[in-house]
């Protein structure tokens, strides 16, 4: 795992929601994320360490209320953890570089993978492929 900023640094530099999601395994309310409707070409990075996580070409509208992707940039970019919280069986996804909470992956996505990476906007930074503009979720 990469060197992660201290909790004090993160609290100072992140919004309350970004800290809650990435550090406390929280979930932003559905349909509220800043990157949910983003359709621009580019790359979605981890908000904490800037590691690339998802290409915009793999993003799709799943209707679930959070940005959804059918595959990460690489298997190493994501860490998978069994999550039995809230009386459910799910697979939590975290940044493979810094361990920040991203969301969950479900086996109900489109081809070619059949997976839906359901990701909190608050855990992402989008970099536009054309002009390099960055948008924090």
Swiss-Prot record:
Catalyzed reactions: L-methionyl-[protein] + [thioredoxin]-disulfide + H2O = L-methionyl-(R)-S-oxide-[protein] + [thioredoxin]-dithiol
UniProt family annotation: Belongs to the MsrB Met sulfoxide reductase family.
Upper classification of the organism: Bacteria, Pseudomonadati, Pseudomonadota, Gammaproteobacteria, Enterobacterales
A GO term from the CC aspect: cytoplasm
Cofactors (names): Zn(2+)
EC numbers on record: 1.8.4.12
GO molecular function, one term: zinc ion binding
PANTHER family reported for this sequence: METHIONINE SULFOXIDE REDUCTASE (PTHR10173), METHIONINE-R-SULFOXIDE REDUCTASE B1 (PTHR10173:SF52)
GO biological process assignments: protein repair; response to oxidative stress
Record keyword Kinase present: no
Keywords, in A-Z order: Metal-binding, Oxidoreductase, Zinc
Name of the protein in its database record: Peptide methionine sulfoxide reductase MsrB
Keyword Acyltransferase attached: no
Residue pairs linked by disulfide bridges in the UniProt entry: none
Co-factor remark: Binds 1 zinc ion per subunit. The zinc ion is important for the structural integrity of the protein.
Residues at the catalytic site: 118 (nucleophile)
Binding-site positions, Zn(2+): 46, 49, 95, 98
Domain annotation MsrB: ranges: 7-129
